[in-house]
């Protein structure tokens, strides 16, 4: 499988589908290693989609002596896109730090960006989000991965979905499994999330931008996503009124795909 020596680490990536180039990034996990099935259905039919492992996740290495910052993770992606000779790329950030990486790329290398999508995002942490993310990290450190996993799943899914799917969400092969036995990486990912701050630079983003607001998201809901819509010139905002932190279930996924593909088709 492809790896590249990027920004002083070995960076694992995969490319799926064909068409106009797009990058899809999530939170503290990966769309690689079979997880491409979690991409928006039909995305790889219309686009050549790059997915990759963040530093310390999956098959990507990391240097713990390098200060973790969103700018570092964004520079990894920038150098990977340059390595692949990709430009004019749709940046799709979903449910966490992938959104923040997209913001930094759009600000620092606008030549690479055709459009940007953010969902489950923030421009900077208010005290509430800061304490939430820090608490997730502390629970992992002090109580172990499985307790952390359960704690975050309860925050991330609607009660009805959690009740019906708890057996699939939890356990060694469940959600955020990339962080099992990998607290050091989680610590660094959270540090980058806590210190991320593009609030005063949002106006420099020129790429067409879609901000999706998840009305029932208890982590990164409209409180943290609306400032992005307000701060980015010409940004389009759409609210999914019955969605929590993670888009889950057939109906929500269909609604999300309709919103996403409608935006991409215009740009």
Regions found by a protein language model. Name each.
Residues 103-107, 114-143:
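Flexible "cap/lid" loop of the alpha/beta hydrolase fold
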Residues 127-129, 147-196, 200-201:
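Conserved alpha/beta-hydrolase catalytic His-Asp/Glu region
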Residues 216-220:
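Acidic catalytic loop of the alpha/beta-hydrolase fold
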């Amino acid at each position: 499988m492809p790896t590249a020596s990027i920004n002083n680490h070995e960076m694992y990536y995969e490319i799926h589908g064909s068409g106009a180039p797009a990058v899809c990034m999530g939170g503290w996990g990966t769309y690689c290693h079979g997880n491409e099935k979690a991409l928006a259905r039909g995305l790889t039919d219309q686009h050549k989609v790059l997915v990759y492992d963040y530093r310390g996740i999956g098959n990507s290495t990391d240097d713990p002596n390098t200060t973790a910052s969103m700018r570092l993770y964004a520079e990894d992606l920038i150098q990977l896109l340059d390595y692949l000779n990709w430009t004019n790329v749709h940046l799709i950030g979903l449910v966490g730090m992938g959104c923040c990486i997209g913001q930094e790329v759009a600000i620092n290398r606008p030549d690479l960006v055709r459009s940007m999508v953010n969902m489950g995002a923030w421009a900077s942490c208010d005290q509430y989000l800061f304490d939430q993310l820090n608490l997730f990290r502390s629970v992992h450190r002090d109580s172990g991965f499985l307790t952390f996993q359960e704690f975050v799943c309860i925050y991330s899914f609607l009660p009805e979905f959690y009740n019906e799917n708890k057996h699939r969400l939890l356990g060694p092969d469940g959600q955020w499994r990339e962080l099992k036995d990998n607290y050091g990486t989680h610590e660094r990912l959270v540090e980058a999330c806590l210190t991320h701050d593009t609030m005063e630079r949002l106006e420099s983003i020129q790429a067409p931008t879609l901000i999706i607001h998840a009305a029932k998201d208890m982590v990164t809901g409209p409180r943290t996503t609306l400032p992005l819509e307000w701060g980015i010139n010409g940004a389009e905002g759409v609210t999914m009124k019955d969605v929590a932190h993670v888009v889950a279930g057939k109906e929500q996924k269909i609604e999300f795909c309709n919103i996403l593909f409608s935006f991409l088709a215009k740009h």
